Amino acid sequence: MGTIHLFRKPQRSFFGKLLREFRLVAADRRSWKILLFGVINLICTGFLLMWCSSTNSIALTAYTYLTIFDLFSLMTCLISYWVTLRKPSPVYSFGFERLEVLAVFASTVLAQLGALFILKESAERFLEQPEIHTGRLLVGTFVALCFNLFTMLSIRNKPFAYVSEAASTSWLQEHVADLSRSLCGIIPGLSSIFLPRMNPFVLIDLAGAFALCITYMLIEINNYFAVDTASAIAIALMTFGTMYPMSVYSGKVLLQTTPPHVIGQLDKLIREVSTLDGVLEVRNEHFWTLGFGSLAGSVHVRIRRDANEQMVLAHVTNRLYTLVSTLTVQIFKDDWIRPALLSGPVAANVLNFSDHHVIPMPLLKGTDDLNPVTSTPAKPSSPPPEFSFNTPGKNVNPVILLNTQTRPYGFGLNHGHTPYSSMLNQGLGVPGIGATQGLRTGFTNIPSRYGTNNRIGQPRP
């Protein structure tokens, strides 16, 4: 029978756990500003959706989706604060840094799905273009632009700031960079403003507002309603082109890949580690991106028998810690030994050692012989670690197998196979190599019976 718990602790539901973590984040003063912007975002998004319905403008709807993306970015910022408050647990030993990577990936993918929805609706509108009312179009444009810029420039969103710098440039950034170089060639004083890489979120907000302003002007002047659909397609393409590089970068981080720009540096560090005093080999190295700007890795280092494990571990960690923040180093000594000979009494039914194969098995070392820091056998008589993990039969005593195979009669040979040690000690029948030139093997060096056969009692002719 199991243990009876009189006062069992009630299990929290998913929403209960979520509410508890939200209270943990809300207790931090740094999150109050984010929560305030989140409330304002919900209010602005509600008004913009009503104005989209009244104006019947799909271009304004596409621009409103950028405001919804700002709400996702604020949620990502809250998750980033929550990650800094939580410590690694036994279940999540590397911490919760990958959660903010997942939040960035989900936000960018949802923005791209919204852009695809706008493209689908725009394709339907090309067949039957409805009438656009410009009453709230310009007002909604400036409200969305001001709020988007104010949110992006006021809130320090570390995950999106890192991704926007680390990811490849979008086609919109490349075209704007070309225009900026041409403009700075005419007016050199603008180089400090336009030549640096522009924020992709600010750039798409400005470009979308510019497209809506052109839409408003053309509809007011010529009642050209098709320009609203064209502007919606342009905003959707700019949104997709801006979010795609970020989703690719965050997806690669989730797949635990190694960043291309650090592969050369890691190779250089591995070569430096392999030249350290006492290090014989560095193998099974694996490095991956744990979070934004943090690498994790594991490496196996084989050292000499007389090398100091703690010194080698300190030097290896010191070399790799410049790039790899979370590092696991497994050190084992180059300790190949000969198995011990059979010891103890032999059973009475064993006729002769030479008619049997003796397979000595190494004994399992106790836990007291292990180094608690590196999990490396401390004594030089221990087997190599790669042959010590989950090896069956380590606690089995030496096994003696009876050799019952016989050879045909009439050739003057023994009935049993010639022992491996006897063959080597006899020089494999090569003239000039006597019995004194035996080789060391992992089997017993029993004196050979060349020319005798005790089993049938007949001398060799």
Swiss-Prot record:
Residues 1-33, 86-98, 156-200, 245-461 are cytoplasmic. Keywords: Antiport, Golgi apparatus, Ion transport, Membrane, Transmembrane, Transmembrane helix, Transport, Zinc, Zinc transport. Residues 371-392 are annotated as: Disordered. One of its GO terms (cellular component) is Golgi apparatus. The keyword DNA-binding does not apply. One of its GO terms (molecular function) is antiporter activity. It holds the Pfam family Cation_efflux. GO terms for biological process: regulation of zinc ion transport; zinc ion import into Golgi lumen; zinc ion transport. This is Zinc transporter 6. It comes from Homo sapiens (Human).
